[in-house]
Amino acid sequence: MSNTQAERSIIGMIDMFHKYTGRDGKIEKPSLLTMMKENFPNFLSACDKKGIHYLATVFEKKDKNEDKKIDFSEFLSLLGDIAADYHKQSHGAAPCSGGSQ
């Protein structure tokens, strides 16, 4: 039986996390910035147009345990923020409209 679209989406997020992690299974700041630029260029562009420099603060905001790395739960929190922004857009909000950003 093949995976559903939802299952493929989750597997894709896990694969994205693994692509940018180090040997310890966590993402360091340079890799997180690369991941954001490669995978969310439209989101970042919309934020930049509003004068919101998302990349300047995202690492510090998401590194909840302050270990200077992003673990999987912190990564999911980041994706949740981006998904929430796209959800707001589906209801007419402007891109990068705030909230948990």
Swiss-Prot record:
Similarity-based family: Belongs to the S-100 family.
Subcellular location: Cytoplasm
Annotated positions binding Zn(2+) 2: 28, 38, 66
Stored SUPFAM superfamilies: EF-hand
A single MF term (Gene Ontology): identical protein binding
PANTHER family on file: PROTEIN S100-A7A, S100 CALCIUM-BINDING PROTEIN
GO biological process: endothelial cell migration
Gene: S100A7A
One annotated Gene Ontology cellular component of this protein: cytosol
Binding site for Zn(2+) 1: 18, 87, 91
Source species: Homo sapiens
Binding site for Ca(2+): 63, 65, 67, 69, 74
Start and end residues of each EF-hand domain: 13-48, 50-85
UniProtKB keywords: Calcium, Cytoplasm, Metal-binding, Repeat, Zinc
InterPro entries per the UniProt record, alphabetical: EF-hand-dom_pair, EF_Hand_1_Ca_BS, EF_hand_dom, S-100_dom, S100/CaBP7/8-like_CS, S100_Ca-bd_sub
Lineage: Eukaryota, Metazoa, Chordata, Craniata, Vertebrata
Role, per record: May be involved in epidermal differentiation and inflammation and might therefore be important for the pathogenesis of psoriasis and other diseases.
Protein name: Protein S100-A7A
One Pfam family matching this protein: S_100
